[in-house]
């Protein structure tokens, strides 16, 4: 049964590979280049574009975020959290956010 599945899957994968090669030749974005080796890819920095801030909001509070270039994070001042930006892509999963108000919490705990 497994070999029959493999026999049916192999031609489909070959067709898919052929189609993707053809599509790669004809569906090219003007001005875009394909990187053939890793060193060329490593030279291109992945930076966050602040223009994206008009579309992004905090997933928890739905409030606008502020871009902090020094830490490369998107900050929600209201909640005191910061979302990391990795390779130019904001990681806006709430569990990935770090708190920015640790000092304030410590001060409140120390005061009687």
Curated annotation (Swiss-Prot):
GO terms for biological process: GPI anchor biosynthetic process; protein stabilization. GO terms for cellular component: endoplasmic reticulum membrane; glycosylphosphatidylinositol-N-acetylglucosaminyltransferase (GPI-GnT) complex; mitochondrion; plasma membrane. InterPro entries: Trm112-like. Residues 1-34 form a transit peptide. SUPFAM superfamilies: Trm112p-like. Residues 49-95 form the TRM112 domain. Its main location: mitochondrion. Keywords: Mitochondrion, Transit peptide. Belongs to the PREY family. HAMAP family: UPF0434 (MF_01187). In mitochondria, S-adenosylmethionine-dependent methyltransferase chaperone that supports both coenzyme Q biosynthesis, by stabilizing its components, such as COQ5, and NADH:ubiquinone oxidoreductase complex (complex I, MT-ND1) assembly, by stabilizing complex I assembly factors, such as NDUFAF5. Interacts (via TRM112 domain) with NDUFAF5; the interaction is direct and stabilizes NDUFAF5 protein. Interacts with COQ5; the interaction is direct, stabilizes COQ5 protein and associates PYURF with COQ enzyme complex. This is Protein preY, mitochondrial.
């Amino acid at each position: 049964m497994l070999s029959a599945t493999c026999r049916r899957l192999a031609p489909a994968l070959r067709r898919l590979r052929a189609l993707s090669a053809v599509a790669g030749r004809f569906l090219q974005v003007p001005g875009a280049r394909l990187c053939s080796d890793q060193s060329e890819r490593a030279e291109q920095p992945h930076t966050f574009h602040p223009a994206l801030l008009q579309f992004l909001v905090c997933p928890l509070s739905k409030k606008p975020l502020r871009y902090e270039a020094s830490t490369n994070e998107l900050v929600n001042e209201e909640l005191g959290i910061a979302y990391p930006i990795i390779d130019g892509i904001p990681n806006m999963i709430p569990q990935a956010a770090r708190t920015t108000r640790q000092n304030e919490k410590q001060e409140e705990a120390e005061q009687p």
